[in-house]
């Protein structure tokens, strides 16, 4: 698959096969993700990959973020209650994804937008390579509303959660 095709055809997937992703394929995906550009070449991102019980625990914690998103969804999709219910179901199980990635960055200071952009570029690489390799993904920002709980669970300090990616 060429780059143009990957960019045009990649979609957010919300229902996954239970098939584990081979370790060598994950290494390939993360290797390419980390080739993303970064301001001042800081490369100050960190990715946490969770599977099995740890993934299930994370999903349980992150699913509480739906409570914070529901009022926004009610406004956006007042005429489409099925979308709201589908979103609620997705947050509870993440579509059965076999793994979840949490993407963080280490900020240089309180107003550090460069670091946010750095990790966003790496996430985009990750999503495109996963798609090119036949894997689905979904860039989720909702779980950021429960960042403190997720970070405590992962043992992360002094970093900012940007996304959860099943």
What are these regions (language model features)?
Residues 29, 33, 101, 106-152:
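Small-aliphatic-rich amphipathic alpha-helix that forms the alpha element of a beta-alpha
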């Amino acid at each position: 698959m060429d780059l143009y095709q990957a960019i045009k055809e990649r979609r957010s997937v919300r229902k996954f096969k239970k098939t584990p992703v081979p370790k060598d394929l994950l290494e390939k995906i993360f290797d390419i993700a980390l080739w993303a550009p970064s301001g001042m070449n800081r490369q100050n991102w960190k990715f946490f990959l969770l599977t099995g019980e740890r993934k299930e625990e994370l999903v349980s914690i992150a699913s509480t973020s739906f409570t914070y998103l529901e009022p926004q969804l009610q406004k956006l999709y007042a005429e489409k209650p099925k979308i709201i219910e589908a979103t609620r179901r997705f947050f509870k199980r993440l579509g059965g994804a076999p793994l979840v990635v949490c993407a963080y960055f280490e900020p240089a200071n309180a107003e550090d937008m460069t670091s946010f952009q750095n990790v966003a570029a790496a996430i985009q690489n990750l999503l495109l390579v996963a798609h090119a390799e036949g894997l689905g993904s979904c860039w989720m920002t909702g779980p950021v509303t429960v960042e403190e709980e997720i970070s405590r669970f992962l043992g992360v300090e002094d970093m900012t959660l940007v996304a959860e990616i099943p």
